[in-house]
Curated annotation (Swiss-Prot):
<feature type="active site" description="Proton acceptor">
    <location>
        <position position="20"/>
    </location>
</feature>
<keyword id="KW-0963">Cytoplasm</keyword>
<keyword id="KW-0820">tRNA-binding</keyword>
<dbReference type="GO" id="GO:0072344">
    <property type="term" value="P:rescue of stalled ribosome"/>
</dbReference>
<feature type="binding site">
    <location>
        <position position="113"/>
    </location>
    <ligand>
        <name>tRNA</name>
    </ligand>
</feature>
<dbReference type="Pfam" id="PF01195">
    <property type="entry name" value="Pept_tRNA_hydro"/>
</dbReference>
<keyword id="KW-0378">Hydrolase</keyword>
<dbReference type="GO" id="GO:0006515">
    <property type="term" value="P:protein quality control for misfolded or incompletely synthesized proteins"/>
</dbReference>
<protein>
    <recommendedName>
        <fullName>Peptidyl-tRNA hydrolase</fullName>
        <ecNumber>3.1.1.29</ecNumber>
    </recommendedName>
</protein>
<feature type="site" description="Discriminates between blocked and unblocked aminoacyl-tRNA">
    <location>
        <position position="10"/>
    </location>
</feature>
<comment type="function">
    <text>Hydrolyzes ribosome-free peptidyl-tRNAs (with 1 or more amino acids incorporated), which drop off the ribosome during protein synthesis, or as a result of ribosome stalling.</text>
</comment>
<feature type="binding site">
    <location>
        <position position="65"/>
    </location>
    <ligand>
        <name>tRNA</name>
    </ligand>
</feature>
<comment type="function">
    <text>Catalyzes the release of premature peptidyl moieties from peptidyl-tRNA molecules trapped in stalled 50S ribosomal subunits, and thus maintains levels of free tRNAs and 50S ribosomes.</text>
</comment>
<dbReference type="GO" id="GO:0005737">
    <property type="term" value="C:cytoplasm"/>
</dbReference>
<dbReference type="GO" id="GO:0000049">
    <property type="term" value="F:tRNA binding"/>
</dbReference>
<comment type="similarity">
    <text>Belongs to the PTH family.</text>
</comment>
<feature type="binding site">
    <location>
        <position position="15"/>
    </location>
    <ligand>
        <name>tRNA</name>
    </ligand>
</feature>
Amino acid sequence: MFYLLAGLGNPGKKYELSRHNAGFMIVDAIASEFYFPSFRERHNALISIGNIKSHRVILVKPWTFMNNSGAPIMSIASLYKIPLDNIIIFHDEVEINFCTIRVKKSGGNAGHNGLKSIDNLLGKDYWRVRFGIGRPINKTNLKIDLSYYVLSQFHNIKAVNNTILNIVEHITLLLEKKPSMFMEKVKNLIKYEDIPTE
């Protein structure tokens, strides 16, 4: 039985390290750590099939823009007959503090357009790993446009990379359906802020 691990993001070099591409960054790190083969394009997505210990896994990066993420995920899940309980979506979440990780199954999409697209095509009964990017830190009392914020690059990329490494290190707990244990393991011991580190 396959597991489908999909990271949400936007294609293109200009978006590579943006907050909205946290999902892509996590999937890339998983692929690197577990020696997955190079991604190839199928069904409007980049996919790679490999193993995480004893688990057979398909990594997916929808190669559509965020608002259309659901279609390639639905196509791949249908092709490989993957049940919703074996689908894990990694995505950014503005309502969660920076570099805080939350896991849930089902529930609302909190206005996230990538999740809306998936919900519309697959329903809601899949797993979500929510990577906190927080809301903009505004010390000047100027209004910061949320779409500009999520499409901008992280400032504290070191904290992001450390958090992603924690996710990758404990990913098997998610595959074993142990979300509470996973969240405990990936909890950062210090509170990070997404501000320039230099």
